[in-house]
């Protein structure tokens, strides 16, 4: 019988195949235990998505709420595990919690990004805790979270996306972090409860629509270094009563401050070269606007419907006015009664809609701009407006007294009455163009004294006296011909004296070039013509636009602490408190050490005649002083005629 011997090679081959199969199954099982990028899993009521894998771990993003859970308070851990693998939580996915019923959220350290619309329209969300590791907040991330009361932003946040917090109607304060680099447009649009904002020192600008329609915003300080304010940045911030624009500011966007109803005044810094369409439109309480000489273009509708605005001094280098499509620059600024157009203006755009109260336009150039023609020929107000030009321009081109429906004249009236219509002998004056008084005495009726204007040469607090020199030609725009100067111009304030109730006429000075032409006179030039003794000096401060004046302050030109005086009842009296002073007026700042209750006025005319108003106050203050007549003989302070006290001639 034949004995069978087992085939060991076959057994070995079978065993090898089985081992390979078992190894493959084990390998497949091991591979399946590691999730792939994009896989999701749930933990603690929250779904996570794998965004990166590595040996023994990976990263996940918070993806959404687990539909099977009813989570209202989310405490996100810094790491989660799935299948024995630990994943770091590093971001929140787009629309992760959009429209959910979450009330509170705590995000862990390690999260660096909140993606687009992650918490959008979570209307019940009241509190969010963000980690210090956060650097990016995406578009619409918290938009429409109407119950969210605060949002403390970590200092390393560099990016805030478009409309990231738009419609967060309960947030009251926002502090932009130091690490910010980019803020998308409309970032805080319609945060209707927002009251205050803190901006970092390194912030370069305020983006488009950043705080648009933040109707309760009343406190924001722009740091030095801000270079631009983009379009609609503060549009609709109805509670914003004041804002200081930094000297570093170089650009303002369209409608940047439109609808800031409480904004009372604004000073544009000297790096700004133009104001675009609607920049300050619908600012219904705006009273004062100061523009630097650097502004060469003003867009259309810049001040439209600013119904408290009484006057704007246009800068000396201005070239274009209202060349856009929004109508007249001053449309429905119905408190405005006059406008001065500098000689530098080369182009005026659409001017068919002007303030209803406008009655005077002063043209400094050699020709009336064509841009005014449409208003004169089509607007019913044309016949009620007088255009004033220089005497030489009138005689050469407009001697008929009419141009395209306007009256044209060179004689500008001034009536000696106060704001209440009461006849007065003294008024203060400041104009944004040169004033020539050398013909103001022509054709006066019997008993009417000529109109005289005076600068304040000196003041003596011990005597209670203000010493005034007559000036026949009052220059304006004193900085217009200073090379390289682009700041706000300076204007000459004077006191005028005439017969109470009388109407006088002055003219635009022929030397007003408005743009630094060689003929533009300085104060010393004008005083030389007037032959006054103290050329170049004037203590008066002229106001060509309405201004808010404090009773005491540090003088911006001299750096000296001063007390401010206004003319009232024939004497300079201390201002009783802060308040608005109307345009075309002036006031007297005196050093605190010179401050007295009231000051009498001593006038020196061009012919050398001197007289004093408030003489009894002058005498009472002079006990113990020596007085002399013009021959040098000592005399009594009550002597008639001209007497001399401390080198000053006084007429009694």
Which stretches of residues belong to each language-model region?
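Boundary at the C-terminal end of the N-terminal hydrophobic targeting segment
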Residues: 33-40
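C-terminal outer-membrane/trafficking sorting elements
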Residues: 454-462, 607-652
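Positively charged n-region of N-terminal signal peptides that target proteins for export
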Residues: 2-3, 12-21, 652
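Consensus positions within tandem repeat domains that build extended binding/scaffold surfaces
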Residues: 94-95, 115-118, 138-141, 161-164, ...
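Sec-dependent N-terminal signal peptides
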Residues: 21-30
């Amino acid at each position: 019988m034949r004995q069978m011997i087992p085939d060991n090679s076959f057994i070995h081959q079978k065993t090898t195949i089985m081992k390979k199969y078992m190894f493959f199954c084990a390998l497949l099982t091991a591979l399946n235990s590691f999730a792939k990028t994009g896989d999701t899993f749930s933990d603690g009521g929250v779904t996570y998505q794998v965004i990166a894998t590595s040996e023994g771990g990976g990263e996940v993003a918070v993806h959404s709420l687990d539909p099977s859970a009813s989570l209202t308070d989310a405490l996100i851990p810094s790491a989660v595990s799935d299948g024995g693998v630990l994943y770091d939580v590093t971001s929140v996915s787009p629309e992760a919690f959009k429209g959910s019923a979450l009330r509170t959220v705590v995000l862990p350290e390690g999260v660096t990004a909140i993606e687009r619309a992650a918490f959008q329209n979570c209307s019940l969300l009241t509190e969010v805790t963000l980690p210090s590791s956060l650097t990016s907040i995406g578009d619409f991330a918290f938009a429409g979270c109407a119950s969210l009361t605060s949002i403390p932003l970590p200092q390393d946040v560099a990016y805030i996306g478009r409309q990231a917090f738009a419609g967060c109607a309960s947030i009251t304060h926002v502090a932009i972090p130091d690490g910010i680099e980019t803020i998308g447009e409309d970032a805080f649009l319609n945060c209707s409860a927002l009251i205050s904002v803190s901006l970092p020192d390194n912030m370069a600008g305020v983006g488009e629509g950043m705080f648009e329609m933040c109707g309760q915003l009343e406190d924001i300080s722009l740091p030095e270094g801000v270079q631009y304010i983009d379009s609609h940045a503060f549009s609709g911030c109805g509670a914003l009563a004041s804002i200081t624009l930094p000297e570093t500011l170089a650009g303002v966007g369209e409608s940047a401050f439109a609808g800031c109803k409480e904004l009372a005044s604004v000073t544009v810094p000297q790096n700004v070269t133009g104001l675009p369409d609607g920049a300050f439109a619908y600012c219904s309480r705006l009273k004062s606007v100061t523009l630097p000489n650097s502004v060469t273009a003003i867009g259309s509708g810049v001040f439209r419907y600013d119904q408290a605005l009484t006057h704007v001094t246009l800068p000396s280098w201005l070239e274009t006015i209202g060349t856009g499509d929004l109508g007249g620059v001053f449309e429905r600024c119905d408190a405005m009664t006059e406008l001065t157009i500098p000689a530098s203006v080369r182009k005026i755009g659409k001017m068919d809609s002007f303030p209803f109260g406008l009655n005077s336009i002063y043209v400094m150039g050699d020709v009336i701009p064509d841009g005014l023609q449409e208003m004169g020929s089509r607007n019913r107000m044309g016949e009620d407006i007088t255009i004033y030009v220089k005497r030489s321009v009138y005689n050469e081109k407009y001697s008929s007294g009419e141009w395209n429906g306007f009256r044209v004249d060179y004689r500008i009236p001034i009536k000696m009455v106060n704001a209440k219509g009461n006849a007065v002998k003294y008024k203060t004056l400041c104009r944004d163009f040169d004033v020539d008084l050398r013909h103001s005495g022509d054709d006066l009726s019997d008993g009417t004294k000529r109109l005289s204007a005076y600068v304040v040469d000196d003041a003596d607090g011990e005597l209670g006296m203000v010493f005034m020199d007559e000036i026949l030609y009052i220059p304006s725009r004193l900085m217009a011909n200073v090379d390289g100067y682009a700041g706000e111009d300076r204007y000459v304030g004077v006191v005028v004296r005439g017969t109470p109730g009388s109407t006088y006429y002055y003219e635009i000075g022929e030397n007003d070039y408005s743009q630094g032409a060689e003929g533009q006179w300085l104060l010393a030039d004008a005083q030389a013509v007037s032959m006054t003794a103290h050329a170049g000096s004037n203590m008066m401060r002229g106001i060509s636009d309405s201004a808010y004046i404090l009773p005491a302050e540090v003088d911006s030109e001299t750096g000296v602490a001063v007390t401010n005086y206004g003319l009232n009842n024939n004497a300079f009296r201390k201002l009783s408190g802060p308040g608005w002073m109307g345009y075309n007026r002036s006031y007297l700042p005196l050093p605190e050490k010179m401050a007295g209750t009231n000051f009498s006025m001593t006038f020196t005319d061009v012919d050398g005649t001197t007289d004093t108003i408030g003489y009894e106050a002058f005498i009472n203050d002079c006990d113990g002083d020596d007085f002399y007549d013009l021959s040098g003989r000592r005399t009594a302070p009550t002597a008639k005629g001209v007497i001399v006290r401390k080198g000053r001639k006084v007429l009694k």
